[in-house]
Amino acid sequence: MISRSLFNAGLFLTVIGLTPLSQAQTPSPAQSKSPRPSYSLAPYEDRLAAAQSVKVTISILGLELGSTLEQAHAKLDKLSDPAHPPKEEEEGQERKVLWQLARTDYSAVFVKSDERKRITYINAFLRPGKEIPFEKIGDTKKAPLQDVNTIVWDVLRPNRPLFRVMAKGADRKANNMTIFVVKRPGLERAAD
């Protein structure tokens, strides 16, 4: 009964032309394809080589994975909005800190750290109008996952755990960047 009412309402709106679906044109296959690198489903060896050699932004405002919370405070406290001091929270051995920033292209930075107070996760939000094109963040040909709104790079460097750089935003311009250690139980190496 309810589905019939919804169907009738949808049909009515379509007939009188009030729904965006009734006015939108069906995109051609060329328009709807998301740009995908040719190796996205490539053999493991090719993806590994890409992760080892990719050129991609691995720091935000000078912070990298493995930095200490003390280093993060030294860099971000002075950039913080005085009306919004950093917010800290502990959850087990993990620590979380949020900075609302005043004098950068970023409006906020959120980090998580491990039991050694080393950063394992960074999430940064860009201000409106300060979005960064995916191509300026990294080599899009070496990103195994991407579409028009999201791109993800795997990064593997000597003596470092596998980590991931992810950018999100409309029209291949990031308004949000996340860098994090990929946790693989039983396979993790300590980052010193």
Model-derived features with residue positions:
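Short hydrophobic/aromatic-rich motifs at helix boundaries and adjacent loops
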Residues: 6, 40-45, 107-110
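Bacterial Sec-dependent signal peptides at the C-terminal "C-region" and cleavage site
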Residues: 18-26
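Short, compositionally biased low-complexity segments enriched in polar/charged residues
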Residues: 97-113
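Non-cytosolic coordination micro-motifs
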Residues: 25-94, 98, 115-192
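Bacterial N-terminal signal peptides
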Residues: 9-18
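Bacterial N-terminal signal peptides that target proteins for export
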Residues: 1-10
